[in-house]
């Protein structure tokens, strides 16, 4: 049985968020097209995601070195590792997220920090870091109200580009993508822009 992890990184309802609308459309079609797969949903705005602070970092580093952790270090390291274990157990992962203030929501950033662990998602070598989870199949559903694919705002796009770089660090270099952009910048075209993205999400879900 294929294990599929759906990650939603936006706390707004679908009627107010294009990335959440894409998530729900993709999820519905995926379940319809792959009825035998085991689907798990992770809502990062509802999840327990303690800030990636010095105590958590210390705990994870001590754990990797085989050292003794304090009770609080162990508690926080266990939380981070629980999300990492869930990620590692998935054969396919779908990530839906917006561009907010040129980047990603803080909850999503924290989650990705949890995943970024040497010896688990990547390893250090004499020739630099090498990803360890290249076998994962990933779909990215990204929405941004402005135009960032080209033009004067292109260099400000640090949402999709950041996530792609993190995944590349893990060895996942060619994720599937559905990108919806410009619906706020071009309100007269918003309906058509969003509709086109929704259709693209449906078609990808069928074959993902």
Swiss-Prot record:
Q: Which Pfam families match?
A: Flavodoxin_2
Q: Which UniProt keywords apply?
A: Flavoprotein, FMN, NAD, Oxidoreductase
- MF annotations from Gene Ontology: electron transfer activity; FMN binding; oxidoreductase activity, acting on NAD(P)H as acceptor; oxidoreductase activity, acting on NAD(P)H, quinone or similar compound as acceptor
Q: Where does FMN bind?
A: 17-19
Q: Into which family does the record put it?
A: Belongs to the azoreductase type 1 family.
- Family annotation (NCBIfam families): PRK13556.1
Question: In its UniProt entry, what is this protein called?
Answer: FMN-dependent NADH:quinone oxidoreductase 1
């Amino acid at each position: 049985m294929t294990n599929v992890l759906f990650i939603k990184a936006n706390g707004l309802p679908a009627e107010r968020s294009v990335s959440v609308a894409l998530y729900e459309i993709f999820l519905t079609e995926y379940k319809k097209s792959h009825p035998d797969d085991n689907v798990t949903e992770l809502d990062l705005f509802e999840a327990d995601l303690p800030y990636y602070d010095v105590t958590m970092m210390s705990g994870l580093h001590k754990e990797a070195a085989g050292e003794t952790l304090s009770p609080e270090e162990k508690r926080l390291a266990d939380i981070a590792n629980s999300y990492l274990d869930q990620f590692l157990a998935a054969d396919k992962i779908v990530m839906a997220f917006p561009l907010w203030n040129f980047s990603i929501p803080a909850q999503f950033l924290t989650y990705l920090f949890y995943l970024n662990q040497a010896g688990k998602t990547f390893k250090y070598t004499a020739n630099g870091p090498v990803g360890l989870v290249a076998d994962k199949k990933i779909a990215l559903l990204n929405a941004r109200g402005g135009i960032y694919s080209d033009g004067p705002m292109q260099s400000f796009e640090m949402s999709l580009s950041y996530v792609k770089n993190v995944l590349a660090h893990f060895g996942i270099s060619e994720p599937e993508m559905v990108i919806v952009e410009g619906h706020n910048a071009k309100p007269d075209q918003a309906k058509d822009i969003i509709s086109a993205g929704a259709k693209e999400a449906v078609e990808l879900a069928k074959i993902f």
